[in-house]
Amino acid sequence: MLLHLPLAELEVGHHLYWQIGNLNIHGQVFLSSWIVIGALLAVVVLGTRKMERDPRGVQNLLEFLWDYLRDLARDQIGEKVYRDWLPFIGTLFLFIFVSNWGGALIPWRIVHLPSGELGAPTADINTTVAMALLVSLAFFYAGLSNKGLKFFEYYVEPTPIMLPFKIIEEFTKPLSLSFRLFGNILADELAVAVLASLVPLLVPLPVMLLGLFTSAIQALIFATLAAFYIGEAVHEEAH
């Protein structure tokens, strides 16, 4: 008997399914995710292979990204504990950024698979929901690890009347994070795929450039909100 998850039934197009035990997983998401992870690892190896005191090329790019993400995490989480969460925020940003740019630049859907369509990882609702749930888990872990059971006072501040609203908020956070990212990236990817198949190469370029811009913005929004939620959990006072 197969285990069916409601979110896993939400799909656009056809999927390449891999069966592992009682689970059907989207194989094309794993394939494209491995491509993204491989690209990130290749850039990191290339940029750190011969470190120089005066950074140039890829090393300079990596140091710029490090400084930018460090400042983002410090501003949203706070000076006290931001270092603990910088790897998490940085990983989210880089994975989403490269996935989004891949969806904007590469017409994944014209790549033929035995079944299904290849697509950017962030164009699959299961990927974005999984990352949003990770952010929610990080929120609770950050709060409990820093404040203990006093963390739950957050739900009745400034007045106990806020309790039901804050409980509802915990459900809307992952929903808004996941569907915002999924919808924007899927729309960009579909636009690039359709135009690339219907018109010459130069015509889709404006759409691709717009897709690159919105893809970068979506990665930044996701990472910033993730850092903000974690900061909200660890701060003695709300933002």
From Swiss-Prot:
GO CC annotation, single: proton-transporting ATP synthase complex
SUPFAM superfamilies registered for this protein in UniProt: F1F0 ATP synthase subunit A
Membrane-spanning parts: 27-47, 86-106, 125-145, 190-210, 211-231
Principal location listed in the UniProt entry: membrane
An example molecular function term from Gene Ontology annotations: proton-transporting ATP synthase activity, rotational mechanism
Subcellular location as annotated: Cellular thylakoid membrane
Protein name stated in the entry: ATP synthase subunit a
InterPro entries, per database record: ATP_syn_F0_a_bact/chloroplast, ATP_synth_F0_asu, ATP_synth_F0_asu_AS, F0_ATP_A_sf
NCBIfam families from the UniProt entry: ATP_synt_6_or_A (TIGR01131)
Species in which this protein is naturally found: Synechococcus sp. (strain RCC307)
Record's function text: Key component of the proton channel; it plays a direct role in the translocation of protons across the membrane.
